[in-house]
Amino acid sequence: MTTTAARMDFETTLKGKYPAKRHAQRVADYIRNKMPGASGVLYLEGRATKLLEDNDEAEPFRQRRYFYYLTGCPLADCHYMYDLDADKSTLFIPPIDPDSVIWSGLPVSVDEAKQRWDVDDVKYTSDVNATLAHVGSSKPKGSSVFALANQVSDKVTFLEFDNKNFSILKEAIEVTRVVKDEYELAIMAKANEISSDGHKMVMQKVKHVQNERELEAVFLGHCIAKGARNQAYHSIVASGRAAATLHYVPNNADMAGKLNLLLDAGGEWDCYASDITRTFPINGKFTKESREIYDIVLKMQNECIAALKEGVLWDDVHLLAHKIAIDGLLQIGILQGDKDEILESRTSVAFFPHGLGHYLGMDTHDTGGNPNYADKDTMFRYLRVRGRLPAGSVITVEPGIYFCNFIIEPFLKDPKHSKYINADVLEKYWDVGGVRIEDNLVITKDGTYNLTTAPKDPEEMEKIIQQS
């Protein structure tokens, strides 16, 4: 069963605080489960202000995800400590710098920080070492400080702790991040709402522009206007045959004479990503060949979404997508021969070379997927999630079929594969470029609900474009 996030009252949820304390407790529980009797503190640092290497401008700031997960704090130059034994969290914020106030205004105060973020105490970063020393000296013998490797400032000392563990904290946060709580899902619903509307706006403009970069500007402008200033990743705005390049970067080609546009773009809300792809006809009407491919990909997505629920093996769903792709490509004549033999030969990888999807959260390719990029089976090598899906996880479902010369030509030259590909029929489809459809799904006990509301029905998209 699939429902849509439009029915989620996420705005009410977002009026509360980001549940940082509960995240810290979950991470602590994981560590204690791995290390019974663990005593000590978790210690993290947010991202520091950093200038570009050859001038006095600051680099664009993005908070460290591990730090944000335990604090909800987007400020630069902050530190954090969580006392495992006392269940007490402390956020350290930069003290007031009078010289900085002249240029940037007053920073967040201690009292404001206490009101804004879900932490038990707030101090200045000038108190970090003294606080660590005080807490460490009160701990029993064998206490530990748990921190992230290569993310501890030289000026910070852990002298009062007997042990320093730089491995398990990263593992603990990455595992606990897989299952989202209600607040995290509300953030992602917000990001999806803004981004879905942005995709629709691009559909409305696609007939009226000449270059891909103009459509990138439409999407970015909409996100910024709605408060989503950061993008989860570099947008892919690929027209014509460029859509066969999975992570197309330039976004600056003229679109005259091309059939379709593939838009893979997602805004970010409070450090959480959306990741949405739509493919639609530039002139408002799919060609016969484009519509055939689109219908195959839409069927791949719909049937894979219908197969999802808690405990489903993601590898099996990816395999299902390939089976549907093979059936569709056989029906239109691009593939020929026995479908089971085609599946066994992995010839369908020529047209669907990537994994079906990935976990989504603070990172676009979020933690916990356990991929195996050394897999000798080419069908599964780029599958970013391996294993069973837990309820509360968010995963993208993004099947695609692509006509990329660089990928397909070696298959045409290999007798093992070429016997299953009708090159004469294939010739009619190169200009389709590539079709991908991507939604963001929350896994539930009995099914899913879809955070993504961007139009994907082919007739609806054609109507939006034609009436714009």
From Swiss-Prot:
Q: What is its EC number?
A: 3.4.11.9
Q: Which InterPro entries match?
A: Aminopep_P_N (IPR007865), Creatin/AminoP/Spt16_N (IPR029149), Creatinase/aminopeptidase-like (IPR036005), Pept_M24 (IPR000994), X-Pro_dipept-like (IPR052433)
Where Mn(2+) 1 is bound, by residue?
275, 398, 438
Domain of life where this protein originates: Eukaryota
Enumerate the transmembrane spans. none
Q: Per UniProt, what is one GO molecular function of this protein?
A: metalloaminopeptidase activity
Q: Which reaction is recorded as catalysed by this protein? A: Release of any N-terminal amino acid, including proline, that is linked to proline, even from a dipeptide or tripeptide
Q: Which UniProt keywords apply?
A: Aminopeptidase, Hydrolase, Manganese, Metal-binding, Metalloprotease, Protease
Which residues are listed for Mn(2+) 2 binding in this entry?
264, 275, 438
* The protein's required cofactors: Mn(2+)
Give the Gene3D superfamilies listed for this entry: Creatinase/methionine aminopeptidase superfamily (3.90.230.10), Creatinase/prolidase N-terminal domain (3.40.350.10)
GO BP annotations of the record are: proteolysis
**Recorded coiled-coil stretches:** none
Q: EC top class, in one word?
A: hydrolase
Which note does the record give on the cofactor? Binds 2 manganese ions per subunit.
CDD domains documented for this protein:
Prolidase (cd01087)
Q: What does this protein do?
A: Catalyzes the removal of a penultimate prolyl residue from the N-termini of peptides.
Q: Which family does it belong to?
A: Belongs to the peptidase M24B family.
Put simply, this protein is called Probable Xaa-Pro aminopeptidase NCU11288
- Lineage, highest ranks first: Eukaryota, Fungi, Dikarya, Ascomycota, Pezizomycotina
